[in-house]
Amino acid sequence: MMSLNDPRWSSFDGAHRVPFDAAAPLTAFLSGKLSDEQFWYVVWNDLFHQDDVGVASYAAVPQIMRICEQQHLFDYNLVTFAAGVERVRHYDDNPALPAWLEAEYRAGLQAIIRYGIRHLTDEWDAATLKSFLMLVAVYKGNLGLCDLLDCVDDGDEQAAINAITNH
């Protein structure tokens, strides 16, 4: 796994298409200098914003999993961030996953899925369950099912039908 001290972090673009050194908030969260709430605010603002992601987002996935596991933190944000990043990385306006990062990124997604399975007996709200199912679907390459799951609580049956017929 790429070290949080690796100088490449500062060169990776975040969700706003500008360099964002994700190692700084990851390190701060790991050391307890950022609360859960502060950390996830940074993640949702700088690593995933309105379906935009960057290489920093991809590189952060395995690190976030490692930190959450160390802190015994399993919640909506972890699975939703991972599912969201994997889902939108296929969009044309987001950067390709660099070949040098692919194995580490995929291992991070697998680890999040395994971590979720270990927490199956925990109490989950509907949003966490939906996000976990979306993560499994998109990880397995079923973008249509992921999109369908995303429409489930919208109450828009036509959006759900469109989601599965457009893939």
Give names to the regions the model predicted.
Residues 1-2, 117:
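Intrinsically disordered, low-complexity regions enriched in Ser/Pro/Gly/Gln/His and often acidic
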Residues 87-167:
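Long, helix-rich interaction regions
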